[in-house]
Amino acid sequence: MKKNQFLKESDVTAESVFFMTRRQVLKALGISAAALSLPHAAHADLLSWFKGNDRPPAPAGKPLEFSKPAAWQNDLPLTPADKVSGYNNFYEFGLDKADPAANAGSLKTDPWTLKISGEVAKPLTLDHDDLTRRFPLEERIYRMRCVEAWSMVVPWIGFPLHKLLALAEPTSNAKYVAFETIYAPEQMPGQQDRFIGGGLKYPYVEGLRLDEAMHPLTLMTVGVYGKALPPQNGAPVRLIVPWKYGFKGIKSIVSIKLTRERPPTTWNLAAPDEYGFYANVNPHVDHPRWSQATERFIGSGGILDVQRQPTLLFNGYAEQVASLYRGLDLRENF
């Protein structure tokens, strides 16, 4: 990993920005409630032009002990904590970007159980404390690219997924890794009400090929900005795969299962022509309803000050991950 090769100063979200929520924008534009149940990126271009002042506070989780390996650090200013904790997609708590911060306090994250099962020789169960104590934690500054064509730069804290999988000892039959979010409708209003939850089928599920899961970049994430993850960011543990669109970063994980067959994934089930299994960041493969050739940085100004820059293949991590897809048609396997 070459230090600082993926980021430049313009990548970093400025301090003053925070956008109006999706529901406020859609209501103002006369878009019906039924339209809110469409796949989450449908109205992204509308949302991104507005900003408001109802920014929630930065996360106040428990401080974590972690190292800062030089390979994953840089000297650039970061997207401020209140932006990462206040501008989220977590449909279990609502469709608006501010809904997770407003509603996720109902999620009980301790006690917690994460089970690793399936095609493994040694099934494992981790509790809440294991998530921050079982493996050495490290801070990694990654670019985060949403399928909605906006991005942030975030200092995540966690451990490589391959270390956890190695303890479980995948069998020779294991080809994929399936992930599942907690199902707790009494705590997650979006799991109770299809209009709050975007019409998705819950619990949220995701998947990777085994070689993707074992890649050193793939991070089991338990913290951000030096502290334990806040609920709206996927506490107590979420997945970060920095070369893929953000919806692959499943939150509040309770199950990891190694499988022989490719597992179903939530957004691919909801709209298979729009959200593929791989979901690699690719400027040459557009979403059916908007271009992915450029991305919008959440800047400090208003509508006239929004800046774009070219989207990087694999979100700038091509040197590390392109070999995983050698011989694969990335347009067909999007």
From Swiss-Prot:
Subcellular location(s) of the protein: Periplasm
Record PTM text: Predicted to be exported by the Tat system. The position of the signal peptide cleavage has not been experimentally proven.
EC number: 1.8.5.-
GO molecular function per UniProt: metal ion binding; molybdopterin cofactor binding; oxidoreductase activity, acting on a sulfur group of donors, quinone or similar compound as acceptor
GO CC annotation, single: periplasmic space
Main localization category: periplasm
Alphabetical GO biological process terms: protein repair
Group of enzyme by EC: oxidoreductase
Reactions accelerated catalytically: L-methionyl-[protein] + a quinone + H2O = L-methionyl-(S)-S-oxide-[protein] + a quinol; L-methionyl-[protein] + a quinone + H2O = L-methionyl-(R)-S-oxide-[protein] + a quinol
Signal sequence segment: 1-44
Keyword field: Metal-binding, Molybdenum, Oxidoreductase, Periplasm, Signal
Binding site for Mo-molybdopterin: 88, 91-92, 146, 181, 233, 238, 249-251
Cofactor: binding details: Binds 1 Mo-molybdopterin (Mo-MPT) cofactor per subunit.
Cofactor: Mo-molybdopterin
InterPro entries xrefs: MsrP, OxRdtase_Mopterin-bd_dom, OxRdtase_Mopterin-bd_sf, TAT_signal
SUPFAM superfamilies named in the record: Oxidoreductase molybdopterin-binding domain (SSF56524)
Lyase listed as a keyword: no
Gene3D superfamilies listed in its UniProt record: Oxidoreductase, molybdopterin-binding domain
One protein family per Pfam: Oxidored_molyb
Family note: Belongs to the MsrP family.
SUBUNIT field: Heterodimer of a catalytic subunit (MsrP) and a heme-binding subunit (MsrQ).
HAMAP family named among the record's database cross-references: MsrP
Function of the molecule: Part of the MsrPQ system that repairs oxidized periplasmic proteins containing methionine sulfoxide residues (Met-O), using respiratory chain electrons. Thus protects these proteins from oxidative-stress damage caused by reactive species of oxygen and chlorine generated by the host defense mechanisms. MsrPQ is essential for the maintenance of envelope integrity under bleach stress, rescuing a wide series of structurally unrelated periplasmic proteins from methionine oxidation, including the primary periplasmic chaperone SurA and the lipoprotein Pal.
Protein name in the entry: Protein-methionine-sulfoxide reductase catalytic subunit MsrP
